[in-house]
Amino acid sequence: MRPPGSPELTPTPDAPHYQPGALRTPQAYVVQSGDALSAIAQKYNVNMQALAQVNKLTDPDALQVGQTLTIPLATPRPAVPGVKIIPDSELVYGPLAEKTDVQALIQSKAGYLANYSQVVNGDTLDAAQVVLLAARESSINPRLLLALLEYRSNWLTNPQPDPSLDEQPFGFSDAWYHGLYRQLEWAAIQLNTGYYGWRSKAVTNWILSDGSVVPIDPTINAGTAGVQNFFARLDDYSSWLKDVSPAGFYATYHKLFGDPFDLAIEPLVPADLVQPLMALPFGPGETWFFTGGPHLAWLDGTPYGAIDFAPPGDTQCGDESDAWVTAVADGVVTRTGNGEVILDLDGDGNEGSGWDILYMHIETRDRVQPGTVLHVGDHIGHPSCEGGDATGMHVHIARKFNGEWLSALGPLPFNLSGWVSAGTGEQYVGTLTRNGVILHNFDGASPDNQVQR
């Protein structure tokens, strides 16, 4: 953080990323097993809708192995200056995410949000509760979400905003992403996609809504990349240039919260970070099954930061398991609900600081309560199918540090009771290795994927 009264400084450039160019001649691509149209579009730096249109695909999800796709030429655009918009710590739900009282801010601005409510997961929530729920779930800074809402729809300060945006305040029209909560969820996906894509060097260009391909300035930071990608999904080229300029979204953020770089925490994730000791999430002597290799920590856009374990016995959804998911380390429970439990390992109660563990698919019955102090091996709850897509009862665990989702594939894999995670890069496919023994994940129970502490 910048000390009060000291001058504002220009953020330093990040180390440049390598940038390949856009296609110069049309190409053909033969669909392989496991391909998705979105991934093919990203690989060739073209707009997915344009790719579908050129190939007359009425259902983008119905690709056939061996099918030949024509890759259309993109509309190349010049790179834009490397203007940093926000630091990384202001994109994620980091150590200072709770600095702003969201409820008080919304009421003080007396805009549309001040009287807004929505039913989410069966509960009626006010606007502050909706924003905080979406922010914490996706690990996105609530200040960023509020500033984007204000920039796109004026919902924070205008009591009577444009009625055409009633159910889509970001201007993204989709039957699923309907209402404030789902719109925030959609925004989080775009922000995370840009942030972690830039972090992992998986993206080099933004594909705008008009099909333009804009090379990313190699010196921007991941937080800025997240914001640039958000606007890329909504804008044509001229609108995008304005939105990512100092006179665009940055000006709205600065007006609401001051210079975002005053709140920068750098580095957010130290290069020499070491995972603390963690145990497998079940009791000593028990045999569970490694059912899911590295896959999305949360929704689309997050890294492959989660792995799955299923208990012994019948694991059909709808049944109950009396097996116990346990604490992987000492900590305090900061949040529960809709299948989730968050365990804060530094014990300060701030989900955005230090190490935090997400447990997903924890049954409501016997689930641990917020504020409970736990020691390694203490009960969290029972594995189930609650809280999202699941083909059988299991527990999904993922890690965050200072609000950033950590990959289970990279230099900091899971180490649970000495079992170290690895993956192929294909979602859900991976291994656990300990003392030369290698377990391969399997969606079921087999001698080849059974694991013990």
Stretches found by the model and what they are:
Residues P13-Q49, Q67-L69, L73, I85-I86, ...:
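Primarily a LysM-type cell-wall glycan-binding module
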Residues V31, D35-V54, G66, A135, ...:
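Short alpha-helical segments in extracytoplasmic peptidoglycan/chitin-binding modules
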Residues G82-L241:
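Catalytic glycan-binding domains that act on GlcNAc-containing polysaccharides
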Residues S173-T291, V429-R453:
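Non-catalytic cell-wall polysaccharide-engagement segments
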Residues P276, D319, Q369-H375, A398-R453:
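Acidic, glycine-rich catalytic/binding loops that coordinate metals and/or anionic ligands
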Residues F290, G331-V333, G371-P383:
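A structural signal for short beta-strand/turn segments enriched in small hydrophobics and glycine
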Residues E320-P370, G392-H394, A398:
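Zn2+-dependent peptidoglycan hydrolase active-site motif and core
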